[in-house]
Amino acid sequence: MDQDDPAEALTELREKRLGLLEIVQAAAGSGLAVYTIWALLLQPGFRRVPLRLQVPYVGASARQVENVLSLLRGRPGKMVDLGSGDGRIVLAAHQCGLRPAMGYELNPWLVGLARLHAWRAGCSASVCYHRKDLWKVSLRDCHNVSVFLAPSVLQLLEDKLQAELPVGARVVSGRFPLPTWQPVAVVGEGTDRVWAYDVHGSGPTVSSCGVPIKAIPESSSTLVPRAPV
């Protein structure tokens, strides 16, 4: 399978056998879908987000979280997760030394769940979860960014990242690669695969004519030294 093909990645997600955790997450997702319909009809703040910029929630697996951390661990500077869902990536980032760590999520149920997880882990005073539209978050002081977003919004996200991130920042994208940026590191296989991108003085390296970059040809991972800050 072409690891960078969003259609094939989505097919693999559908074909994976569901365990108990996945079933619980699916049930939660159904509830969130009902909430989304309600929010679209009744909640003005949610209605103001264009439909093409709304991203469905799919929780990251433990392997996906670890793959993200493997590309960020040891780096200085603020870490943010855009569309942080139930907060698992932010909490894990804080626990492995990425500080400050914070998440931005528009869905109030998920923000509440993230804060509950942080409280249960004894980290409620150390990690921050904000209920805020990720498109309105300023990234000018962020040096480490993680995203697990749908392919339909990644092109627009590239524009925001390039306009706002400081030199030396690193972006890690899970499940799907950024469409025109060239990764400096790739870890994992299949739906657990994540891509790292570094921002340089002239901006990130992009492919010619906007053609998506193919994954770095390694069986499991390819790593490079972290970007200077």
Curated annotation (Swiss-Prot):
The chain crosses the membrane at residues 20-42. It is an enzyme of class 2 (transferase). Residues 43-77 are annotated as: Pre-methyltransferase (preMT). One of its GO terms (cellular component) is mitochondrial membrane. One of its GO terms (biological process) is peptidyl-lysine trimethylation. Its EC number is 2.1.1.-. It is a single-pass membrane protein. Residues 1-22 are annotated as: N-terminal sequence (NTS). GO terms for molecular function: protein-lysine N-methyltransferase activity. InterPro entries: FAM173A/B (IPR026170), SAM-dependent_MTases_sf (IPR029063). Residues 43-77 are annotated as: Methyltransferase (MTase). It is found in: Mitochondrion membrane. It catalyses: L-lysyl-[protein] + 3 S-adenosyl-L-methionine = N(6),N(6),N(6)-trimethyl-L-lysyl-[protein] + 3 S-adenosyl-L-homocysteine + 3 H(+). Its main location: mitochondrion. Keywords: Membrane, Methyltransferase, Mitochondrion, S-adenosyl-L-methionine, Transferase, Transmembrane, Transmembrane helix. Belongs to the ANT/ATPSC lysine N-methyltransferase family. The pre-methyltransferase (preMT) region is responsible for mitochondrial localization. Mitochondrial protein-lysine N-methyltransferase that trimethylates adenine nucleotide translocases ANT2/SLC25A5 and ANT3/SLC25A6, thereby regulating mitochondrial respiration. Probably also trimethylates ANT1/SLC25A4. This is Adenine nucleotide translocase lysine N-methyltransferase. The lineage of its organism: Eukaryota, Metazoa, Chordata, Craniata, Vertebrata. The gene is Antkmt.
